Each structure stands twice: as C-alpha cells, then as structure tokens.
C-alpha cells in the first residue's frame, strides 16, 4: 500500500543507515585509539581485568626501579669491599717484608699507616643514596637493610611486597662507637688462629676509629717489634682478609640475586603488557578492512534512502498532473 503519511521503505533504509553509521563510528574510534575495549561500556569484564593488570604493571615498574637502585647500592659496597681487600693484601705484604732481617720497620710502619688511612677512606666513601653498609658513625648498630624485590597479587586479590634482607653486621668494617661491631676495628685473638694455641689471648686490632677495644694491641710496628709479634699480626691480617672475602662473596651473591629478580620483573611486565593487549587492543588490519566495508555500506545506504524517497516524489507528481 502506498501512503502519503508513511514511507516504510524510507524508514527501513534510515534504520539501516543509522546502524551502519553507529558501526562506522565505533570502528573509527577503535582505529584512532588503538583499542577495541577503551572504556567499561565497551566490555566491562575485559576493561576491569585490563585496568587491574595495568595497575599491577605500574607497581612492578616501581619495583623494577627499586631493584635497579638496590643493585647500584650493593655494587657500590661491593666495589669498596674489593678495594679494601686489595689494600689489606698490601698491608699483609708489608708485614711480611718487615719480617726480613735488617729492614727499617719504622719506614714500613709509615707505609702501613698510609694503607690504613686508605681503608678508612674507602669505608667512609662507600655511601650510596644516604646509606653506608661498611662504615657506622652512629651509636646504634646499622642492623638489617631491606631492598624491595617483588610485588605479588595472590588468587584472592590481596597484594604483598617482598624484600631482600641483608644483615650489615656481615659488612661493617669500621664502627666508631663499638669497635666490636667492625671487622677492622674489632679485636682478633692471634693465639686462637695458631695450629697449636697456648690458651693465652693475644688480641690485635687494625684501625682505631676513636674507641679502641680494651686489652688489644693496634697493628703497627717499629724497630722493636719482635718476630713473634709480626707473626701474630700477619695471622690476624690474614684472618681479616678471609672474613672480608666472605663478606664480599655475600654482597656478590646479593647482587646476582637482585639482577635475576630484576630480569624476572622486566619479563613479567612484558608478559602483562601482552596480556592486556590481547584483551583490549584492536586488530588494526581487521578494523581497517571493516572501515572500508562500512564506508561502502554507508554509501549504499544513502542511495537506498534516496531511492525509497522517490515513492513520495512519484505521488507528488500524480497530484501535480
């Protein structure tokens, strides 16, 4: 039936054109933003998951930065410890040289004193971001230090942050308040280091940082120093080198662990990025193909609407005739 009030063909063509325009707008939005799920209205479930994953990735990025800072910090302490071991090896060599008959022990002692100053300087200079694990100028012990290691989200949605902990008692070289807390300021019993100890303590310390250990002798020599005393000093220095080596090995292990964790966090961030992309990213090849198809459909829809409107025009001509 032909009516002057209603044009069903035009109405159908108009509805089709509206649907095409809506799809075209959606496709153009995906191409311009790069996302097929940009807001919760697009897909509430995917948007919620992606938003949580992005939040976790931002936290992991902070953890990654903290690990990098921690690695640089431990590298600083390790480098200083390595320098200290080299200087201690020089001190041991000087003491061995002093054991030779006829040498001027006073001159050698001046060299040893300079090397001890280098030890003090190396320990004090091993500071990074306001922390120093080798030198303690405070009254309290440095205690345990923590480095952020990872960010974890459990199955129930709860969040935890784990840390790498290090007891600085293993690395403090100089303690100005309590010499017993520093490897180079504490007293070491030379008698206990002998293969056949006598049971009589002969305590020595290397550096006097302001509070020397009671009942101990500083490692320094002069022409009156006996061969037995030199032997004790060499044994003590050798023991300190062994302790320093163990401490450096521990720092090296911490560095290795941090680097492994840093690599893991970086890989985890990449995996999360890929996961988010699979949920919300638009397939640009698919969307560009759809865009061309919708543009063609839009043109056809406009033509269909134009054709549908010719019915009303034909009725108008009948009345005009």
Curated annotation (Swiss-Prot):
GO cellular component terms listed in the entry, alphabetical order = bacterial-type flagellum; extracellular region
Q: Which domain of life is it from?
A: Bacteria
Keyword Secreted in record: yes
Q: Which regions form coiled coils?
A: none
The record's annotation in Gene3D superfamilies points to: f41 fragment of flagellin, N-terminal domain
Question: Which InterPro entries does this chain map to?
Answer: Flagellin (IPR001492), Flagellin_C (IPR046358), Flagellin_N (IPR001029)
Q: Pfam families in the record, alphabetically? A: Flagellin_C, Flagellin_N
Q: Which family does it belong to?
A: Belongs to the bacterial flagellin family.
- Protein role: Flagellin is the subunit protein which polymerizes to form the filaments of bacterial flagella.
Per its record, how is this protein called by name?
Flagellin C
């Amino acid at each position: 039936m032909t009516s002057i009030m209603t044009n069903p063909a035009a109405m159908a063509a108009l509805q089709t054109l509206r649907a095409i325009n809506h799809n075209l707008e959606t496709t153009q939005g995906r191409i311009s933003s790069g996302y097929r799920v940009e807001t919760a209205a697009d897909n509430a479930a995917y948007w919620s998951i992606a938003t949580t994953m992005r939040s976790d990735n931002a936290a992991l990025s902070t953890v990654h930065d903290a690990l990098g800072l921690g690695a640089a910090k431990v590298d600083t302490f390790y480098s200083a410890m390595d320098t200290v071991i080299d200087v201690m090896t020089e001190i041991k060599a000087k003491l061995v040289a002093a054991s030779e008959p006829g040498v001027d022990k006073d001159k050698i002692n001046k060299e040893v004193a300079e090397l001890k100053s280098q030890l003090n300087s190396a320990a004090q200079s091993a500071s990074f971001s306001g922390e120093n694990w080798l030198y303690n100028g405070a009254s309290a012990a440095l205690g345990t230090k923590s480095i952020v290691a990872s960010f974890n989200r459990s199955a129930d949605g709860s969040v935890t942050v784990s840390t790498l902990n290090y007891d600085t008692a293993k690395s403090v070289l100089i303690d100005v308040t309590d010499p017993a807390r520093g490897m180079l300021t504490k007293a070491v019993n030379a008698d206990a280091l002998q293969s056949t100890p006598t049971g009589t303590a002969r305590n020595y310390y290397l550096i006097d940082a302001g509070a020397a250990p009671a009942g101990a002798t500083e490692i320094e020599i002069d022409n009156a120093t006996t061969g037995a005393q030199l032997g004790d000093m060499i044994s003590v220095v050798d023991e300190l080198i062994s302790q320093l080596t163990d401490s450096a090995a521990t720092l090296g292990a911490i560095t290795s662990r941090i680097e492994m964790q840093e690599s893991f966090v970086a890989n985890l961030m990449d995996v999360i990025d890929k996961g988010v992309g699979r949920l919300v990213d638009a397939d640009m090849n698919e969307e560009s193909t759809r865009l061309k198809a919708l543009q063609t459909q839009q043109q056809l829809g406009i033509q269909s609407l134009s054709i549908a409107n010719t019915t009303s025009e034909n009725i108008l001509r009948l009345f005009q005739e």
